[in-house]
A protein has these predicted regions:
Chain A
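C-terminal motif of bacterial Sec signal peptides marking the signal peptidase cleavage site
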Residues: 18-21
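Hinge/cleft segment of the Venus flytrap/periplasmic-binding protein
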Residues: 11, 23-24, 31-49, 180, ...
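An alpha-beta-alpha
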Residues: 55-59, 70, 159-205, 209-210, ...
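Structural motif
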Residues: 82-105, 209-231, 245
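Hydrophobic alpha-helical
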Residues: 111-128, 196, 213-273
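Extracytoplasmic "Venus flytrap"
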Residues: 33-77, 82-100, 106, 112-116, ...
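Flexible loop/hinge segments that line or gate small-molecule binding clefts
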Residues: 117-156, 176, 269-281
Length: 343, 342
């Protein structure tokens, strides 16, 4: 168990705090042994911590995995009492859920807001009430609204996917690269696309065809079917999201095309299994950790109990933790499969 | 033809002759229905107290319930008028979104900062009212079935909201606006006060004015209403405009609550509002409506949601409970309607 945790906390993390700028994301492995003692100290039951957890509706696999992973993580600690409320895409309702946590005088709130800006006022209210707020994935628009923030690296996902495709298509400046984006309105989608375009530009490639889906299987099928009609020949496709990827794969099967390879996004278990078996168009996927909520639970517990993050010298929990977006291929898939989500 | 659209109830026309006697029967049965709602709400509160104890009966928790109810409550009061008048509006959530976006554009906020924050309120009301007006005109004069016309508005208004906001969340930086709506009057949050005022005004308008009587007449039997000299088309337009204004006001409240305007605001509010109106005892076919019932309907749903939250209950159980409540309410309604109608 300590090893698994180390993998998640250290290996797959980029710490976006100034004080860790010197360490960066270099400690990839080899650390589980000597730091074990620190972790055990942190795991010792401390004072009881009541944590409220609220996230958007679990309408796709990744989002469902966020809540499930958070629940599982809280279950590991005898000193954590987790209160999970109904996932909702209605900001009005989510605000009232946080208000309920404030009324209950919980010790900490782990919040993945449907809309970061819309939940900022109530998060500020919670912080003013002395509650430790941990912001997950979608950022508030005020630095005072959260004690600490756990983020995935959307721009980095695009960079990782683009860099991988560049390597695979080395020297082919006429290659056709297609992109199937997620919900285009979300800043996260714009960040992913920006990183992707930048990485491709680095090796003289560009996105020839771009379509957008909505993270759902149905929308993925529709977008991919259109894309395959629009482009007669494709060399590589990056699909932002493995949940919609189920639909994308179905559309590709229907078309009978196989001249290209695919790179997924987010990192679902079924795509990783396909990569491992090497029997489909997916040759790689880029991880957007679905364990962010679980990391939020851990940070909340540490912050409330006044403990530090084990592998840092600093005695306080960092302000911001930005997770890394690694490329998963056949070679390293076994490392990421255990924390992948089921879509 | 507005008659045709407004009248889903052709299968169950209210005979003109009996209207007098039905009115009195209505009053008594409406009171009866409200008693049922009060009982349901009391049972829910009991369940809350038993399962969550002090956490439920706390003043702060009651205010949390009321704040949650306020936004959807204002929309539901407006929806009560439209449904009582024999119509339906599926576009309310989209209108809330569009109003919230329009009232928070940089241009509007700039104007609000250089003049007064009330500009944002008027913008939201104007946008909501205009959307309602368009709906009403389409339905009354364009002879488009209400279901279709407002379905079209749903798509168009949300699309327009996305275009205006460029699908981004617009953050409000108008200090006076936030300060006003965050305040409390004698310990009651302003948002809750607004809901109470709207509900009271709605009750007076529906039960104590010519406008209200015409609404019942138009919803009950548009043809008879027309023969009685009521301008059914004009009245239909007014009803939808009124609902649009309510949506604009709800948008203002949502902006205050979230400090943002967004094209994603108000998602599925049409279903929540229609559900609250229907379990409140307003007939979907028109001709009967009760503001008090609607307020109880809203409170029942929000209290339910609160009790589930307090008890840490699963994500899906609440939806099942909501569905069950709606079915029971409609079944009850049908029985009451059969008893008094035939």
């Amino acid at each position: 168990m300590p090893h698994k945790r180390t993998t998640r906390l250290v290996a797959a993390l980029t710490l976006g705090v100034a004080l860790t700028a010197c360490t960066g994301n270099t400690p990839q492995n080899t650390q589980s042994g000597d730091k074990g003692g620190v972790k055990v100290a942190n795991d010792e039951p401390g004072k009881k911590v009541v944590i409220g957890f609220s996230a958007p509706a679990a309408d796709h696999g990744w989002m469902a995995a966020i809540t499930n992973a958070a629940k599982a993580e809280a279950g590991k600690y005898s000193d954590v009492e987790l209160r999970v409320v109904e996932g909702t895409n209605d900001v009005n309702l989510q605000i009232s859920q946080v208000e309920t946590f404030i009324n209950d005088k919980v010790d900490a709130i782990v919040l993945l807001p449907f809309d970061g800006a819309a939940l900022t006022p109530v998060a500020l209210k919670a912080m003013k009430a002395g509650i430790t707020v941990i912001n997950v994935d979608r950022q508030f628009d005020s630095p005072f609204a959260a004690r600490s923030t756990v983020l995935g690296d959307n721009h980095g996902m695009g960079v990782s996917a683009g860099t991988y495709i560049c390597e695979k298509l080395k020297g082919r400046s006429d290659a056709v690269v297609a992109e199937i984006a997620g919900i285009d309105s979300l800043p996260l989608t714009q960040d992913r696309s920006k990183g992707f375009a930048e990485a491709l530009a680095n090796c003289g490639l560009k996105v020839s065809n771009r379509v957008a889906a909505e993270f759902t299987v149905e929308s993925g099928e529709k977008a991919a079917a259109n894309l395959l009609q629009a482009a007669r020949k494709i060399d590589a496709i990056w699909n932002h999201d493995d949940d919609q990827g189920v639909g994308v794969t179905a559309a590709i099967k229907n078309s009978g095309r196989s001249e290209f390879f695919m790179v997924g996004g987010a990192g679902s278990a079924n795509v990783m299994r396909e990569i491992k078996a090497d029997n489909g168009s997916h040759k790689a996927t880029v991880v957007y950790p679905s364990t962010q909520g679980a990391d939020g639970i851990r940070l909340a517990r540490l912050a409330v109990q006044g403990k530090s993050l084990g592998d840092l010298v600093e005695v306080e929990v960092p302000r911001q933790v930005e997770l890394y977006a690694p490329v998963v291929t056949k070679e390293n898939v076994d490392r990421y499969l255990p924390t992948a989500f089921e879509s | 033809m507005s008659e045709d659209t407004a009248v889903t109830p052709t299968n169950r026309p209210v005979p003109v002759k009996e209207s007098q006697s039905t009115v009195s029967a209505l009053l008594s049965s409406a009171a009866g229905r409200n008693t049922g709602l009060v009982v349901a709400l009391v049972l829910l509160c009991l369940a809350g107290v038993v399962t969550a104890g002090d956490r439920f009966a706390d003043v702060d928790n009651v205010l949390t319930i009321l704040r949650l109810a306020a936004v959807i409550g204002v929309v539901s009061v407006g929806m009560t008028f439209v449904i009582t008048g024999g119509g339906i509006d599926l576009s309310v959530g989209a209108i809330v979104a569009l109003s919230s976006v329009w009232a928070t554009t940089l241009a509007t906020q700039g104007l609000a900062n250089s003049t007064h924050w009330i500009v944002m309120v008027f913008t939201a009301l104007a946008v909501g009212g205009a959307c309602g007006l368009v709906n009403g005109v389409l339905i009354a004069y364009g002879r488009v079935v209400a279901f279709i016309a407002t379905l079209a508005s749903l798509a168009a208004a949300r699309g327009l909201a996305e275009i205006i906001s460029n699908r981004k969340t617009q953050i409000v930086n108008v200090p006076g606006f936030a300060a006003f709506f965050d305040a409390s009057v004698l310990g009651v949050p302003v948002l809750v006060v607004i809901f109470a005022v709207v509900a009271a005004a709605g009750w007076v308008l529906l039960n104590r004015t010519t406008f209200g009587r015409r609404t019942f007449a138009v919803g009950g039997n548009p043809e008879a209403a027309r023969l009685a000299g009521i301008d059914v088309r004009r009245h239909t337009v007014l009803l939808y405009t009124l609902l649009g204004l309510c949506c604009g006001l709800a948008a203002v409240m949502l902006i205050a609550r979230t400090t943002t305007g967004s094209a994603t605001h108000g998602g599925l509010y049409e279903l929540d509002a229609i559900a609250a109106v229907v379990i409140g005892g307003t007939l979907l076919s028109g001709g009967r409506g009760t503001i008090a019932g609607t307020v109880f309907g809203v409170l029942i749903f929000t209290t339910l949601s609160n009790v589930f939250t307090l008890n840490n209950l699963s994500i899906s159980a609440q939806a099942v409970a909501k569905g069950a409540i709606i079915v029971v309410a409609v079944l009850l309604q049908q029985r009451l309607a059969r008893r008094s109608g035939v």
